[in-house]
Amino acid sequence: MNSASSASASERLGRAARRCRAALSVFALAIAAAASLYPGGSWTEPGAAGFSPLRNFWCDLVRTQAINGADNSASRRLSCVAFAALACALWWFWPIAGALLPPGRGALLQVLGRISTLALFAMALLPSDAHPVWHGVVALAGGGLGMTCAALCCIRCPAEPRYSLRRASAYAALLLAALNAALYIYVAYVHGPETPLQPGVQKLATLALVLWMAVTVRRALAERDLSGAAAR
């Protein structure tokens, strides 16, 4: 790669990193605001007030009507902003994560990752109360692709320590997402009982995802700076 193309790639990486971080910040603020405005009700406590991280799913926030029967318009609007921001963050994240991998694997990651991101957009447009079947299908398809991407990212970078926060958070995101998907299938399709376990696992999977994204962006920028210093 010549110096001009290398500089261009470095600029693209930096631009994607800034956008990814900004979108993650919007997601965190918007999802917190949406949760604070949720009227109440969960599948295990239909008459409860407010949003419970251990009893409510994120998709409860995008319902037109809360589970307790109250209007959920305000929370729905903010949660749609939150999930759109997360989807944008992921859209810019996949090329960043791919930059740490061998070229062929990185290109595959970018394609699969961006397809899974489109599924996240679709989930916001297909709330579970209005489209229960399609919401589940899109969630499982997008989640499966996302888990494949996380597995691709578990590979160790050349200069990376054997045990790193980037790889540990990727493994955590992968395992928690797999457990969340298994619990979803058990409840939705095998008709298992509703418990606080799945909503709790979902929140842990989200935290692991955000941590993995943040650490990966930092790692990619550090690798870029090292490469730039070596080239000078």
Across the structure, where does each feature detected by a protein language model lie?
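Terminal transmembrane helical module of multi-pass membrane proteins
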Residues: 152-232
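Membrane-proximal helix-loop-helix units in multi-pass membrane proteins
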Residues: 109-157
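Extracytosolic (periplasmic/ER-lumenal) interhelical loops and adjacent juxtamembrane/interface segments
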Residues: 44-71
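Hydrophobic cores of alpha-helical transmembrane segments in multi-pass inner/ER membrane proteins
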Residues: 24-28, 83-91, 144-153, 205-219
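Cytoplasmic juxtamembrane regions at transmembrane-helix boundaries
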Residues: 89-117
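Short, Lys/Arg-rich, polar N-terminal cytosolic tail immediately upstream
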Residues: 1-13
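N-terminal signal-anchor transmembrane alpha helix
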Residues: 14-44
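Individual transmembrane alpha-helix segments
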Residues: 65-100
